[in-house]
Design a protein with these regions (language model features):
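Iron-associated oxidoreductase/ferritin-like identity signal
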Residues: 1-62
């Protein structure tokens, strides 16, 4: 089993989380159902929190 460099894993995951924030928010902005749009906005907020945590960890590792 190959080991994965922590910084590489964090950078890859950060990119994924940032894409999810954009995707969820784009869907929320386009939906005509306010309840579902709000749900997608919450998803975007949660992913943004994850992205911030990952960025902080990356800064600690540098």
């Amino acid at each position: 089993m190959n080991s994965v460099d922590a910084k590489s894993a964090l950078r890859n995951t950060l990119t994924q989380k940032q894409e999810l924030v954009r995707d969820y928010q784009a869907v929320a902005d386009q939906l005509n159902n306010n309840d579902v749009a709000k749900m997608y906005s919450h998803f975007a907020e949660a992913e943004a929190i994850h992205a911030t945590q990952i960025k902080e960890k990356l800064e600690q590792l540098h």
